[in-house]
Amino acid sequence: MHIPKLLAAALLAGASTLHAATPTYLVMDFSTEALMSKSDALAIWKNQLDDKQLKRLNKLYPVSKWGFVSQVEGGFTADKICVVTARAMLVPRSGKALVFKPNKSSTAFDAKANASLVDCKALAAVKLKEAIASVDSSLIAL
């Protein structure tokens, strides 16, 4: 009778890990509001990292110890050229705060001549996606 109880306990433990909730990382954004709002940046983070990736990432970099930071900067030069720099980083977490000591970091940048503000914002979103994908690929092999 002792063995079935152990087997049942093992099955319950295994089942709970299969149906575990998707981990939620602390993500902070410090972008220039003219190019990207915080809500847009957080939506890009959410779309770039799916549930499967987050679960795998949590095994190597636990939610309680790590978080992400993004920053999109740029604007227009005097010659009306849109210049954008986007950076994504994995940083250590200390309680509810992130420590700016990047473990992994990636920067993507580009410039586009004769761009409107809408074009410049779209370019900023593309560059942030590239930076996030680069950091993600350096963390776990997909």
Spans of model-derived segments:
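Short, Lys/Arg-enriched charge-dense amphipathic segments
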Residues: 40-52, 78-95, 122-129, 142
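A structural "domain/chain start" motif
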Residues: 2-55, 139-142
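A short acidic, often aromatic-flanked loop/helix-cap motif at beta-alpha or helix-coil junctions
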Residues: 33-36, 77, 116
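Surface-exposed short loop/turn segments
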Residues: 55-100
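Generic detector of solvent-exposed, compositionally biased contiguous segments
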Residues: 43-59, 101-114
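Short secondary-structure boundary motifs at beta->alpha junctions and helix caps
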Residues: 95-141
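Generic preference for hydrophobic/aromatic residues in regular secondary structure cores
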Residues: 21-25, 66-70, 104-108
